[in-house]
Amino acid sequence: VEYNGGITRSYPINSAWLAGVDYFLHDQSYNNTLNLKLLYKKIIQADSKVPMQFTGVWTCKDLFGLKGLTFDGFADVWFEDHSCNIGVNEDGTNVTKTKHTVFITEPQLWYNVGRHFGCNNLNVGTEIELSNNFGTTLGFKCRPCLGVKWNF
């Protein structure tokens, strides 16, 4: 069972309850994992012709045999009638278009630089958000970023 919801400055996230099946794959060391989910999704205050969500979550540690290099992330696709902004009227109101299919993935690549000087919690890396009709954004977007991460 899972709950999704919240609000941000830019757009609301419709509250939703999810339940379903989960399939977990891994290698012998658990350094490489893949989690696949097929979920029934009940979205509060929104319509969905197909009340489902597909989710994949992965982790690959020591990628390409390089100690400290990790590739991980998730991908979600679901179906929800929601409004995406396509412009602004002269009076300042948003012009919207209703879309139904939503996709988002956020693959991350991290390297543990701290392992070279006794600070194993310190990582540098990147995340790239790839999305289609997510939030109020119409169409495909690519949003890369760089980061420093401290593992607790």
PLM region spans:
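Short loop/turn motifs that connect adjacent beta-strands in outer-membrane beta-barrel proteins
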Residues: 1, 24-34, 61-71, 113-124
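Transmembrane beta-strands of outer-membrane beta-barrel pores
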Residues: 3-9, 25, 38-44, 60, ...
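Residues that define the transmembrane beta-barrel architecture of outer-membrane proteins
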Residues: 11-19, 32, 48-54, 100-105, ...
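Residues on the lipid-exposed face of transmembrane beta-strands in outer-membrane beta-barrel proteins
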Residues: 19-25, 38-40, 54-60, 107-113, ...
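A contiguous pocket-lining binding segment that forms or flanks enzyme active sites
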Residues: 43, 48-78
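Outer-membrane beta-barrel translocator domains and adjoining extracellular loop/strand segments
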Residues: 47-49, 83-96, 135-144
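An amphipathic alpha-helical core segment
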Residues: 72-113, 121-126
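Predominantly the C-terminal beta-signal and adjacent terminal strand-loop region
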Residues: 107-152
